[in-house]
Amino acid sequence: MGDDDEHNSSSTDEGRKEVDIYPLSCYYFGSKEAIVFKDETVSDRITRMKSNYAAYGLRTSVEAVLLVELFKHPHLLLLQLNNSIFKLPGGRLRPGETDIDGLRRKLSNKLSASRDGNEAEWEVGECLGMWWRHDFETLLCPYLPPTVKKPKCTKLFLVRLPESRKFIVPENLKLLAVPLSQVHENHKTYGTVISGVPQLLSKYSINIIDI
Amino acid sequence: MGDDDEHNSSSTDEGRKEVDIYPLSCYYFGSKEAIVFKDETVSDRITRMKSNYAAYGLRTSVEAVLLVELFKHPHLLLLQLNNSIFKLPGGRLRPGETDIDGLRRKLSNKLSASRDGNEAEWEVGECLGMWWRHDFETLLCPYLPPTVKKPKCTKLFLVRLPESRKFIVPENLKLLAVPLSQVHENHKTYGTVISGVPQLLSKYSINIIDI
């Protein structure tokens, strides 16, 4: 639809963005040594965030939206921790690190054979959306809350996968392909950020490539 | 945030998109003759949609996201019908009409002094998202549902407002400025499409311009 737009191409180009996705069977999945998590509990995490904040100020998180095809429907790749929490692959930036460098580092750390692998292999594309929150609160907003002086930000990036690759995942994490239709508005299971991903992708034409 | 990205500028540009918004007080609001609605009831509407479908096939709807500033927070302009239903300004395309031409026509029809006014005055920008549905069902999906052969599509476009203009609204409609924070995830009051707008805007840096 809308392919008959001829005027004003600079503004309609955006509406025609495409993403090619490949069958899940094109990818190889293996495991590697477990990742050591820094915090045992939520309160440990908050303590660590506070001390990091004191040392470095606010840090941005970057997360990746990775898609594959299964049963003719786009599926989102999610990491699952302890058979419960779902996360998009990603994490916090180091002080001074760019969004793209940080996301590549995190993706290699969590999804590649070697942490020091070829990070350029990750094709980090456009920012799809951002979520903001008060310093140490859990409530997320898709806009900068009016009363917040020092917000924390999570940015989502579209990462286009090649037609084949290996995913090597720490053995204490599971990498799952979940249908967009299951994720959409399913806040309870997937949380605010993940359950909103189908909407952020809605302007893209998703092409299923048969191999 | 993210302003320190220097590599790979083609893919980070998208993450830096900006929207300038102006105070509500910069705009003039007036009224004009009521719009005649084609349907009295939902069942009238479905009957009309079916007969249109038989005559023209499926038609795309286009809707505008228009922002103003009030109390230092971005507000979304919504039309309200009968003190109840909220709608983004827009409507269905005519057969063969482009997204941009159709949206400009609808915006002039609902928000300008004259229907035949200068439609180019509306700066229709990028597509923010799309919603799909089965032919005559009301359930909306932000992805093409796998089983649907002939989906209907609603496309949302960002329309940047100039620093001043007149809005002349049919007297049976109200034009309201609603804070993004009130719209966000408020499905009950605003419906699926409108309540998702803050998330679709989240990748933009919204600049409040003081006049």
Residue spans for each PLM region:
Chain A
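N-terminal leader/linker segments that precede catalytic domains of diphosphate-processing enzymes
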Residues: M1-I211
